[in-house]
Amino acid sequence: MSNKEEKTQERRKKNPIINVLKTEWEFLGSRRKLFLFYMFLFFIAGTAGLMTTLVIGWIFNSIQQTMTSDSELRKLIFMIFLLLAIKIIFWMFHGTARILESLTGFHVHKNYTNNKMYKILELPVKWHKDNHSGDTIDKVNRGRGAVENFSSYYTFELMYLLLNIFGSLIILFFVDLKIGIFALTFSSFILVGVMTVDKKLRKYYLQLNKFSNKLSASIFDYLSNIITVITLRLRKTVSKEIDSRLIVSYDTYKKETIINEFKWAFGSIAITLMTVLVLIYQAYTNYHATGIILIGTLYILYGYLRTVGDAFFEFGRFYGKLVKLNARIEGAYSIDDAFEKVRGRVNGKLPYNWKEIEIKNMNFTYDEEWKRNHLENLNMKFRRGQKIALVGESGSGKSTVLAIMRGLYPPQGGEIYCDGEKVRNGFMKLKQHITLIPQDPEIFNNTIKYNITMDLPTRKDDLNKFIEMAQFKKVVARLEKGLDTNVLEKGVSLSGGEKQRLALVRGLLAAKNSDIVLLDEPTSSVDSLNEMKIHENIFRNFKNKTVISSIHRLHLLNKFDYIYLFDRGKIIAEGTLAELRKNYRFKYLMKKYGLRKEVE
């Protein structure tokens, strides 16, 4: 187990309050000093707020004991005005701090969300296949919601709860040492009892989160395949499945609800008992000592006892909320754990001015039991700006090589050499320079423009340039709304080739800043004439980029500088088109695709 994984395990064992605070601190980033500043403002505001009960007690005692002259009346009026001053001071500091807290919470939420998305996008395809998208979405949404709620709304509550408890106890110690000790001891027992129950509830919250993750995964499946559900008349089946996934959490939810209500009943009764006992004690001792029971002193005791009791009780409620939030944050730890396994291989790039890259002894299998190698001891070399073609029959390994180069799958063996020098974590660094444009177009239910730009800022010149490169300009021109046309709008019907060209525009735009562009038959459904023009456009506009293309139609080969011939996961021949024309396996492949004249 790595040090990072051990830290993750330690976080799971920590008190929820500490863990949630550490999570906020981690994602505060450059705003940590600002966090300390507004927490100090909350401290001043909370301290000022505590003075209200004390001042009211003084007012009552003043009226009861010494209200016999104008000077004493003026003193009374001054103390009454103190209540207004306290409120003004409170809002001066509290209001400022709340604004800073809310704005900081926004940035904490942003940092957390970006962190999780970065990690998810860096994880290999195998992880994504093993972890349902709906489950992952639910974990991220719950985690970011928990972090946002705590950092925007809960930190000031925590500060005031601690101030109300310890500030009130300090004042009670000054009023009567015995009462202060009793209140501290009694309240501590209440808090321990409530937190013990919450520790048990934490287990139920984690279970309920898991049930929710699975439910979200099912809902995601059914809604993302709604056409299949409707056409196969699966509405009742789907409803039953959703209901069964809901009902499976009922027993846990029932236990959590009953225990939770018992906890609140216990806390409320215990706090009231503490207050009653202290007030009886104070009234009894004052009466027998002086014959006078001061209303103000009783009010001060009652006010601060109630504040302490309410604060402990509220702390129990607050702790329960934090246990829920912490459980949601912990739910996303599986993403962190998976990322830690690849962290060391993620960062870093090849030299900016690299000239030649060589792949040596690359091995790969989809079979975890290693019964079959899908790629075996593959060796490839390419220069910056070179145009490479990968040819071979279906299943020969062309697409697999491209997927590994882009980092979709980790190879089981192999090294990367850059300008003759071996590169540590070479495949992870190589993928940072690559854009892969796949064969199957993924079209979103949105406008043509959205499908191209993914709603990212894009210069109009770039947009038009790549539309022309992909031979998609005529398609856009025939649509009444042009780029603003929704692909699923009534009357809009894109053919398979047009959908491929739409996806190709998006891929070429994304490849603008990449050194290496991989084409995995992205024009397989495009007619031969447009396919030829597309490749000519790509090679003309991407002169300084390396283009490696898996192609099915071999009439394009005269456009490439170098060719690799694949068969059953191995490279069986390589060279220029002129050189490969002498190879009998290559001749056979050309004849098979009806290009007999090309090899004669």
Language-model-detected regions and their locations in the chain:
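An intracellular "coupling" helix at the cytosolic face of ABC transporter transmembrane type-1 domains
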Residues: 26-33, 125-126, 142-151, 155, ...
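Helix-loop-helix
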Residues: 66-67, 72, 171-185, 259-329
